[in-house]
């Protein structure tokens, strides 16, 4: 299960980050950085004035959900329509803001992860010190995680009967 959770985090692009501040729950979708070489760490970035990053920088607990939708499953029976997906839920705690060199390293790794093959100075301008100083990155140490997935075709009672009325199958939504 930890290998599956790590694989889902490595494949995902958007995390939904949930936290409670002053009794009010929040969920914020965010790009994130995850590297299987440091499997219990996840990184978030944003404005130094960000409510979320400021709150988590004080060590607050957070829940993170990442879901990848792989396909729409249609059935000849309404009850058996479904979605193929991979998901992971993590429970973690925030830590203080990373220093400038750590922030630079995480931001470079994020660009490489989201935009493979791009290089600073060739494909985009090198980040200036003021750009790095204007961005907060915090590390989250994952305490617990669990993965869940649904794979496969429809499982309705008549889905394997080609002469039954209606249609059944999977619309593949996975990105190459």
Each model region followed by its residue ranges:
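Active-site-proximal "nucleotidyltransferase
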Residues: 1-15, 173-175
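A generic structural signal for nonpolar/aromatic side chains embedded in well-ordered alpha-helices
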Residues: 9, 55-56, 110, 140
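Short beta-strand segments
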Residues: 11-48, 64, 74-80
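Short gly/pro-enriched beta-turn/loop segments at secondary-structure junctions
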Residues: 12, 83, 132-135
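Conserved hydrophobic/aromatic beta-strand scaffold that supports enzyme active sites
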Residues: 16, 27, 43, 63, ...
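A structural signal for short, well-ordered beta-strand segments
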Residues: 32, 92-94, 138, 142
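Short, structured beta-strand-loop surface elements
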Residues: 48-109
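C-terminal edge-of-domain segments
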Residues: 98-176
């Amino acid at each position: 299960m930890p290998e599956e959770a790590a694989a889902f985090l490595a494949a995902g692009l958007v995390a939904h980050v949930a936290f409670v501040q002053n009794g009010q729950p929040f969920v914020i979708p965010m790009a994130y950085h995850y590297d299987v070489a440091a499997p219990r760490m996840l990184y978030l970035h944003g404005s130094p004035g960000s409510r979320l990053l400021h709150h988590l920088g004080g060590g607050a607990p957070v829940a993170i959900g990442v879901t990848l939708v792989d396909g729409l499953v249609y059935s000849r029976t309404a009850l058996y329509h479904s979605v193929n997906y991979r998901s992971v839920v993590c429970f973690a705690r925030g830590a203080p803001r990373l220093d400038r060199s750590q922030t630079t390293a995480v931001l470079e790794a994020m660009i490489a992860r989201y935009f493979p093959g791009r290089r600073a100075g060739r494909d985009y301008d090198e980040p200036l010190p003021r750009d790095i100083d204007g961005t907060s990155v915090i590390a989250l140490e994952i305490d617990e995680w669990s993965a869940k997935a649904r794979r496969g075709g429809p499982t309705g009672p008549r889905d394997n009967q080609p002469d039954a009325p209606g249609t059944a199958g999977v619309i593949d939504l996975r990105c190459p």
